[in-house]
Amino acid sequence: MPCLLPPTQVPEAPSISANNGVLFSSFALLFMFFNSLAISLGSKELYRSSRSCTICSSLIPCRTLIFSLWIDFASDSGASVLVCCFSASLPLVFFFWALFSLSLSFQDDIFLGLYNSGNPVPQLLVLRVPLSLLSTESDVSFSTISPSKSITMVAE
């Protein structure tokens, strides 16, 4: 009697979203490493700029040279508001975004809520990431919700 074996299953090739998720998570880990390294150096140049946030109206010093240059470069645009308020939380956003894009690739959207405890005004950063972002035709929405003001930034 011939031995009937079940058909072998060919493993699926990794999807584009999984590859990009690994890329984003490795970028976030490297970014957090350099962020902590810059904080530990404690150079006065890294703490030289301090701007008033338009959302929480508090002075927040730049913690890294990367964010300092970004705020100086984008001081007249809406990106400086995001960097000013959430400079410490931004690498974590990218890291968790990468983890969720790896594990929840079947979902339509990913919602992340981060409570910013560094500001006197309670605020919530909501990052809405469509998974079609991995193509070039979608956008990312950053919504900041506070008791007094709210701002929505859309980057295409």
UniProtKB/Swiss-Prot annotation:
Q: Does the keyword Membrane apply?
A: yes
Question: Which residue ranges traverse the bilayer?
Answer: 21-41, 54-74, 80-100
What is its subcellular localisation?
Answer: Membrane
Keyword terms: Membrane, Transmembrane, Transmembrane helix
Q: Does the keyword tRNA processing apply?
A: no
Q: Kindly give the membrane topology term recorded for this protein.
A: Multi-pass membrane protein
**What would be one Gene Ontology cellular-component term for the protein?**
membrane
Query: Additional info?
Result: Partially overlaps RBA50.
Its name, as the record gives it, is: Putative uncharacterized protein YDR526C
Species per Swiss-Prot/TrEMBL record:
Saccharomyces cerevisiae (strain ATCC 204508 / S288c) (Baker's yeast)
